[in-house]
């Protein structure tokens, strides 16, 4: 057992959830875990009671000269604050998960000579990790290839995959049974944790124009924004499509395991969960994501044979209906994609990332004894 670890993450779910998964793995091994983030992580503090959460000052760069000057000042103060914290906590190593709130802690760890690593969830290196990559000892990636890494980073880089929550791991590689003639077809429609307007504007009308025999087979789970629920529900009801709509499903892993096909965004966590459970998907990347990273995530998934990609500007009800009719009528293609999705999954990501952290910590101990 190694005494303690520090995790630095931006204050949004995309950065915090992988950190939580690693924390759970390390806590299970008897270590203490400290999370260093900004005030946005307050809601996260209660998710795993054993994680000690510390707020570090940070601000996002960008905007005008005045904002940039303020942000640089906050980052400098946050780095000094993180240095004091890390000296007191004395972690075996420090792992960063991206997001601007991770920068002060990671710079502080580097300046103190602590063992460091970063984990990049997306198929494109994020801006914070792009700054930190040349400075840390190891780089872990969620995808087989990550744009933005330098050739010189290769020897320090390993693919661990993206850690997923325990509820997803419990359903890893659930057997896929393609829809058969006359049986129901389970569709799961997700637009990220807050839903997405395009999913409600384009997908229900597309399903409504499917042939009657196909519409009658559909069993739809649709996560939509609260303001979009009435309109989508009216379309489903008018066209006699069995659909359950909610603004947030608490049982997404179970619904995903039941699904014959998912229609969703291409965030790193979504793609990881699709792959670990092994479900085919039509991915519609959010076109305004930083560095267009969702498009890169979706392309990696599709290139593995696990699904299909439709750019948001090309998502029109009439053409999408024909697309779905052909796809849902091809059980062999769905089964093959489900198999390849499972092959693409990395259910041991949290364990492999924990092993990397432990090796870094043990290496530091060995160097300390030698000195």
Positions of PLM-derived features:
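Glycosyltransferase specificity loop/lid
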Residues: 3-73
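Acidic donor-binding loop of glycosyltransferase active sites
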Residues: 91-93, 257-272, 279-280
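C-terminal alpha-helical cap of glycosyltransferases
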Residues: 2, 346-371
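An aromatic- and histidine-rich active-site surface loop
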Residues: 40-44, 93-112
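Donor-nucleotide binding loops and adjacent catalytic segments primarily
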Residues: 23, 27-28, 34-36, 40-51, ...
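Active-site-proximal region of nucleotide-activated glycan assembly enzymes
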Residues: 32, 40, 110-173
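An amphipathic, basic-hydrophobic alpha-helix
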Residues: 64-93
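A short, well-ordered alpha-helix in the C-terminal region of glycosyltransferases
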Residues: 333-347
């Amino acid at each position: 057992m190694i005494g303690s670890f520090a995790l630095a993450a931006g204050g949004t779910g995309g950065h915090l959830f992988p950190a939580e998964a690693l924390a759970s793995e390390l806590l299970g091994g008897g270590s203490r875990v400290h999370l260093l983030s900004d005030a946005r992580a307050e809601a996260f503090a209660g998710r795993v009671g054993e994680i000690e959460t510390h707020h570090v000052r940070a601000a996002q760069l960008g905007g005008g000269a005045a904002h940039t000057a303020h942000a640089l000042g906050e980052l400098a103060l946050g780095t000094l604050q993180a240095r004091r914290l890390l000296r007191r906590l004395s972690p075996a190593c420090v792992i960063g998960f991206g997001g601007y709130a991770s920068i002060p802690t990671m710079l502080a760890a580097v300046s103190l000579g602590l063992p460091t690593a970063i984990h990049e969830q997306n198929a494109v290196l994020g801006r914070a990790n792009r700054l930190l990559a040349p400075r840390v000892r190891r780089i872990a990636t969620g995808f087989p290839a990550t744009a933005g890494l330098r050739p010189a980073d290769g020897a320090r880089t390993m693919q661990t995959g993206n850690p997923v929550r325990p509820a997803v791991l419990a359903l890893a590689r659930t057997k896929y049974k393609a829809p058969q003639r006359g049986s129901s077809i389970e569709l799961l429609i997700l637009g990220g944790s807050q839903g997405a307007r395009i999913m409600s504007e384009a997908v229900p009308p597309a399903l409504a124009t499917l042939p009657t025999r196909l519409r009658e087979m559909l069993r739809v789970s649709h996560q939509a924004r609260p303001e979009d629920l009435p309109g989508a529900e009216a379309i489903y009801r008018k066209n006699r499509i069995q659909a359950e709509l909610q603004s947030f499903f608490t049982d997404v892993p179970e619904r995903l395991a039941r699904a014959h096909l998912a229609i969703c965004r291409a965030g790193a966590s979504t793609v990881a969960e699709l792959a670990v459970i092994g479900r085919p998907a039509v991915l519609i990347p959010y076109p305004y994501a930083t560095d267009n990273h969702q498009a890169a995530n979706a392309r990696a998934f599709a290139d593995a044979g696990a699904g299909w990609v439709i750019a948001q500007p090309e998502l029109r009800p009439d053409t999408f209906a024909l697309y779905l009719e052909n796809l849902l009528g091809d059980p062999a293609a769905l089964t093959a994609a489900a198999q390849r999705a499972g092959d693409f999954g990395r259910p041991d990501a949290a364990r492999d990332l924990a092993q990397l952290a432990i090796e870094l910590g043990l290496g530091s101990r060995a160097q300390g004894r030698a000195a």
